[in-house]
Design a protein with these regions (language model features):
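Conserved donor-binding/catalytic core segment of Leloir-type glycosyltransferases
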Residues: 4, 175-199, 205-216
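Short His-centered aromatic/hydrophobic patch
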Residues: 86-92, 114
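A conserved, positively charged/aromatic
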Residues: 104-138, 150-151
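Acidic anion/phosphate-binding donor-loop and adjacent secondary structure
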Residues: 61-67, 142-146, 160-180, 197
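An amphipathic, basic-hydrophobic alpha-helix
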Residues: 49, 59-83, 93-101, 125
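Donor nucleotide-sugar binding/catalytic pocket of nucleotide-sugar-dependent glycosyltransferases
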Residues: 54, 131-170
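N-terminal strand-loop element at the rim of the active site
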Residues: 5-67, 155, 218
């Protein structure tokens, strides 16, 4: 069996990690795993597992991305995957528009995964257009059935996100020396944020500024 997964890029994030884990599992089970994306730093890790990456600019949130529909349909005709799995909205639209014009007798089966609570509009609705729709939790299933009532409930399956035991061992405890360094770095950062505040502002304002600074720190 050949399975093609489609997502914007392979840099970091839960969707990306899940894509790699599915591809790795498929290869270990003797199947062929393909991933279509704009690329990224996780491509090498994907290919190490034996999966194949196909670079295509399916990541841009613009109308220009519609020019990728024909090339993507050509790719489907060449690769002939058994399953086409869409994981994000922009590549989802590209893949869906390419797929729906293909011969129903020979085109791949379409699967989509709804990973979160997307904004409710026609743009997000593509994630419910799979012949089978995967919801990552019961809350997501409820979101789909409530916000997109036209979705046939029988085609929705709840498949919870798994955890790789080797990467998250149950009894793991970090070394005390590492914890001491980590805590010191965290408090040093928070102290630097608080010390920059105007002494006349309220505690609530300080907290808000700290939260904003934390967001900026995470972004960098």
């Amino acid at each position: 069996m050949k399975v093609m997964q489609v997502l914007p890029e392979l840099n970091s994030g839960g969707v990306e990690r899940g894509t790699l884990e599915v591809a790795d599992f498929l290869v270990k089970q003797g199947h062929e795993a393909l991933v279509v994306s704009n690329g990224g730093r996780l491509v090498a890790k994907l290919e190490e597992s034996g999966a194949r990456h196909i670079a295509m600019p399916v990541h841009r949130k613009s109308l220009g991305s519609l020019f990728q529909v024909r090339p993507f349909r050509k790719l489907l005709e060449q690769e002939k995957p058994d399953i086409l799995h869409i994981r994000s909205r922009v590549p989802g639209w590209i893949a869906y528009l390419a797929w729906r014009k293909m011969d129903k007798a020979t085109r791949p089966r379409l699967v989509s995964t709804v990973h979160g609570f997307y904004s409710v509009n026609r743009y997000s609705a593509v994630m419910t257009k799979g012949e089978r729709v995967i919801a990552v939790s019961e809350s997501i299933r409820e979101y789909i059935t409530t916000k997109y009532p036209a979705t046939v409930q029988e085609k929705i399956s709840v498949i919870h996100r798994g955890v790789e035991p080797s990467q998250f061992p149950r009894d793991f405890q970090p070394e005390p020396s590492w914890l001491e360094i980590w805590r010191g770095e965290q408090w040093e950062w928070w102290d630097s944020v608080i010390m920059r505040q105007d002494p006349c502002i309220t505690t609530g304002q300080i907290l808000l500024n700290c939260l904003c600074a934390a967001v900026e720190n995470e972004a960098t």
